[in-house]
Design a protein with these regions (language model features):
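S-adenosylmethionine/decaboxylated-SAM
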Residues: 1-142
Length: 142
Protein backbone atom coordinates (compact mmCIF):
# COMPACT_ATOMS: atom_id res chain seq x y z
CA UNK A 1 0.00 0.00 0.00
CA UNK A 2 1.17 3.51 -0.73
CA UNK A 3 -0.25 6.87 0.32
CA UNK A 4 0.40 10.25 -1.27
CA UNK A 5 -1.48 13.52 -1.68
CA UNK A 6 0.94 14.91 -4.29
CA UNK A 7 1.54 18.15 -2.40
CA UNK A 8 5.22 18.16 -3.43
CA UNK A 9 5.49 18.59 -7.18
CA UNK A 10 9.09 19.82 -7.22
CA UNK A 11 10.95 16.52 -6.97
CA UNK A 12 14.69 16.98 -7.32
CA UNK A 13 17.87 16.61 -5.27
CA UNK A 14 19.14 19.45 -3.07
CA UNK A 15 22.56 19.34 -4.72
CA UNK A 16 22.58 20.74 -8.24
CA UNK A 17 25.52 18.58 -9.34
CA UNK A 18 23.54 15.38 -8.71
CA UNK A 19 21.88 14.22 -11.94
CA UNK A 20 18.22 13.49 -11.58
CA UNK A 21 15.80 13.12 -14.48
CA UNK A 22 13.12 15.77 -14.66
CA UNK A 23 9.74 14.49 -13.55
CA UNK A 24 7.04 16.75 -14.91
CA UNK A 25 4.08 14.92 -13.41
CA UNK A 26 5.12 12.86 -10.34
CA UNK A 27 1.61 11.48 -9.87
CA UNK A 28 1.37 10.18 -13.43
CA UNK A 29 4.93 8.83 -13.34
CA UNK A 30 4.31 6.96 -10.08
CA UNK A 31 0.91 5.54 -11.00
CA UNK A 32 2.27 4.30 -14.32
CA UNK A 33 4.73 2.12 -12.38
CA UNK A 34 2.14 1.11 -9.77
CA UNK A 35 0.10 -1.40 -11.76
CA UNK A 36 0.65 -4.58 -9.76
CA UNK A 37 -2.78 -5.67 -8.45
CA UNK A 38 -1.20 -6.88 -5.19
CA UNK A 39 -0.70 -3.25 -4.17
CA UNK A 40 -3.19 -0.55 -3.35
CA UNK A 41 -2.76 3.16 -3.57
CA UNK A 42 -4.58 5.79 -1.53
CA UNK A 43 -4.61 9.36 -2.80
CA UNK A 44 -5.11 11.46 0.31
CA UNK A 45 -3.26 13.22 3.09
CA UNK A 46 -1.68 10.68 5.45
CA UNK A 47 -3.29 12.42 8.44
CA UNK A 48 -6.76 11.61 7.11
CA UNK A 49 -6.20 7.84 6.70
CA UNK A 50 -8.76 5.61 8.37
CA UNK A 51 -8.91 1.85 8.96
CA UNK A 52 -11.24 1.63 5.93
CA UNK A 53 -8.39 2.87 3.71
CA UNK A 54 -6.24 -0.17 4.47
CA UNK A 55 -7.07 -3.87 4.27
CA UNK A 56 -4.76 -5.08 7.05
CA UNK A 57 -2.68 -3.33 9.67
CA UNK A 58 0.75 -3.00 8.04
CA UNK A 59 3.76 -4.37 9.88
CA UNK A 60 6.41 -2.84 7.60
CA UNK A 61 6.17 0.89 6.94
CA UNK A 62 8.51 3.00 4.82
CA UNK A 63 7.99 6.68 5.64
CA UNK A 64 9.21 9.19 3.07
CA UNK A 65 6.94 12.18 3.48
CA UNK A 66 7.43 15.52 5.23
CA UNK A 67 10.56 15.45 7.37
CA UNK A 68 10.30 18.74 9.24
CA UNK A 69 10.01 17.90 12.96
CA UNK A 70 6.33 18.80 13.40
CA UNK A 71 5.25 17.56 10.00
CA UNK A 72 6.70 14.09 10.57
CA UNK A 73 5.47 14.08 14.18
CA UNK A 74 1.89 14.94 13.17
CA UNK A 75 1.88 12.48 10.26
CA UNK A 76 3.11 9.53 12.33
CA UNK A 77 0.97 10.48 15.31
CA UNK A 78 -2.10 10.37 13.06
CA UNK A 79 -1.45 6.87 11.72
CA UNK A 80 0.41 4.98 14.45
CA UNK A 81 -2.83 3.30 15.60
CA UNK A 82 -3.31 1.88 12.09
CA UNK A 83 -0.07 -0.13 12.31
CA UNK A 84 0.20 -3.73 13.53
CA UNK A 85 1.00 -4.27 17.20
CA UNK A 86 4.59 -5.11 16.29
CA UNK A 87 6.02 -3.33 13.26
CA UNK A 88 9.13 -2.23 11.41
CA UNK A 89 9.32 1.47 10.62
CA UNK A 90 11.87 2.77 8.14
CA UNK A 91 12.32 6.54 8.12
CA UNK A 92 13.92 7.98 5.03
CA UNK A 93 16.14 11.08 5.16
CA UNK A 94 17.20 10.53 8.78
CA UNK A 95 19.98 13.09 8.33
CA UNK A 96 17.41 15.89 8.17
CA UNK A 97 16.94 17.92 11.35
CA UNK A 98 14.00 16.63 13.37
CA UNK A 99 13.60 13.17 11.86
CA UNK A 100 15.21 11.19 14.68
CA UNK A 101 14.00 13.58 17.39
CA UNK A 102 10.36 13.52 16.31
CA UNK A 103 10.47 9.71 16.23
CA UNK A 104 11.80 9.66 19.79
CA UNK A 105 8.83 11.82 20.82
CA UNK A 106 6.34 9.53 19.04
CA UNK A 107 7.81 6.54 20.89
CA UNK A 108 7.34 8.34 24.22
CA UNK A 109 3.84 9.62 23.47
CA UNK A 110 2.51 6.23 22.35
CA UNK A 111 4.49 4.27 24.95
CA UNK A 112 6.04 2.11 22.25
CA UNK A 113 8.62 -0.50 23.13
CA UNK A 114 11.79 -0.05 21.09
CA UNK A 115 12.93 -3.58 20.29
CA UNK A 116 15.71 -2.66 17.87
CA UNK A 117 16.94 0.32 15.91
CA UNK A 118 19.66 1.28 13.51
CA UNK A 119 20.51 4.81 12.44
CA UNK A 120 22.41 5.01 9.18
CA UNK A 121 23.52 8.62 8.99
CA UNK A 122 25.74 10.00 6.27
CA UNK A 123 28.26 12.82 6.17
CA UNK A 124 27.70 13.88 2.55
CA UNK A 125 24.12 14.78 1.58
CA UNK A 126 22.69 12.87 -1.36
CA UNK A 127 25.76 10.71 -1.86
CA UNK A 128 24.79 8.16 -4.50
CA UNK A 129 27.55 5.83 -3.22
CA UNK A 130 26.17 5.88 0.31
CA UNK A 131 22.73 5.96 1.97
CA UNK A 132 21.69 9.22 0.22
CA UNK A 133 20.26 11.21 3.19
CA UNK A 134 20.32 8.49 5.81
CA UNK A 135 17.82 6.02 7.23
CA UNK A 136 16.49 5.16 10.65
CA UNK A 137 15.15 1.63 10.98
CA UNK A 138 13.13 0.70 14.05
CA UNK A 139 11.35 -2.40 15.30
CA UNK A 140 8.59 -1.26 17.63
CA UNK A 141 5.84 -2.85 19.68
CA UNK A 142 2.70 -1.28 21.08
Amino acid sequence: MAVDNWCNTDIKPMREEVFFPTIKDPRKDFLYKFKDPRWTFVEKDIRSLTPRDICDKPNIIFYDAGHEYWEQYENLDAVIDLFADKFILILDDANFNGVVTSMEEIIKKHDLKLIWQRKILTTIPEDDKDWWNGLQILVLEK
